[in-house]
Amino acid sequence: RPEYEPALRKYQERRDELNQKYTDQQQTKQPSEKQSKNWVSVTEINQLIDELTLETKQYKGYAKLSPKELNVFQDRFMLIFWLSYPVRNDLHTTRVITRRAFNALPREQKETQNFIIGGKPAIEFSIGNYKTRKKYGVKKIRVDDKVVLAAMRQWLSVSPNPDYILVNVKNGEPMSSLNITQALT
């Protein structure tokens, strides 16, 4: 209706102005003031990893670990992994599997699930379950950082379900994307 045209134009101009402001901010790759308040520095993450490392040393030789103690091992692994391989929540429901077992899987399973593939020539992270998989295909990441591999081995040696890389330590079920987000906050 013609009587609404001026209001509609004003709204569209304001919308376009705000969209441009948002685009300009995104182009700078700088966090907003609000984001900066919630930002955690790499130094702070490394300090937390050091604290968790000291805690894991205290539990060495324990026959049975409580869920709280298991979380220390898993949290340490997650932080170390994500510092070297920033893959957001792509570790959700990731199975740990040998290369031979992976090669024997049907193609569809390889392309729709996530795996940590052990064995020669190197450990590999295969990501087949992620939002833009149809566009980019399965991502494969070679895991060759010695600190990450040591943390992974340590975590899997105490994990209640070493068939999955991240689990709910109380029941051994694989972690979902939501569980990972909750664990990191």
Residue ranges, per PLM feature:
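Non-catalytic DNA-binding core/recognition domains of DNA-processing enzymes
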Residues: R1-E13, V143-D144, I180, L184
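A short, glycine-centered helix-capping/turn motif at helix boundaries
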Residues: R1-P2, N71-D75, F81-Q109
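Flexible interdomain linker/hinge and immediately adjacent N-terminus
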Residues: E3-A63, K170
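Basic, Lys/Arg- and aromatic-enriched nucleic-acid-binding interface segment
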Residues: V42-D90
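Short His-Asn-centered micro-motif
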Residues: Y85, R95, G128, V167-V169
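Conserved tyrosine-mediated DNA breakage-rejoining catalytic core shared by Y-recombinases
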Residues: T94-K146
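Active-site/catalytic core of tyrosine-dependent DNA strand-transfer enzymes
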Residues: K134, K140-T185
